[in-house]
Amino acid sequence: MNVGDSVRRALDNWDRRAWGAAVLHAGNAVDGTAKKRYPQLGVATRFKRTIRDSLDIFHIMTAPGIDFDQTRFPVAVNSDLSDKRPDIADVLYGIHRCGHDHESELPNGFELTPHGPRTASVHIWRDGKIQLPASVALGLVAVAVFATENKGEVIPGDYRLSWYQHVFQISGWWGWQDHFREIISVAQFSQVTLDFTESWESWTPL
């Protein structure tokens, strides 16, 4: 399946409030993008690197108040970072890798908070489950849509992303990463590095 189809399916499921399916299809869009950008790398490495390349875009569309660059998550996923403490790219690859066995639901250990008016947040429960905002689907879609490798992808004209007063018709915004970054550069958000001190005490690296 190509990137355009994956983005379309992600947003169709988003509109139906089928959050799990939206995230899984959005992950497929990032996977397709990563394959174009880093064809010589393995699936896990290229998927994570593509997210880290565009962490500013993912962050602004997912949860502007969370510092995803510095936050680490004490959950049971593999990390390729030197200290083995998973970052958001590791967590999202954990969903993507296991999600191929689930057509519409996230794999065990991952939950989503339905999208709504409350500020997006992340929780880690005592049983080790991580609860992410459903808006991670929009963050992943944005990473794919604005990636320069995806200029020329095709999607019907009524699909769009929005950020405050800005509306981005996806059919005309494929690959316009630099321009999107210019638009969001005016944003001023206070970012918080999430503190999971208690959960780290019982965490062990994979």
Residue ranges and their predicted role:
Residues 25-71:
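Short, contiguous, well-structured surface segments enriched in hydrophobic/aromatic residues
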Residues 156-206:
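Sequence termini and other peripheral, non-core segments
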Residues 53-177:
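Long, charged low-complexity segments
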Residues 1-24, 28, 41:
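Charged alpha-helical initiation segments
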Residues 4-7, 48, 94, 98:
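Hydrophobic core segments within long, regular secondary-structure runs in both alpha-
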Residues 15-18, 34-38, 101, 105:
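Hydrophobic/aromatic-lined pockets within catalytic cores
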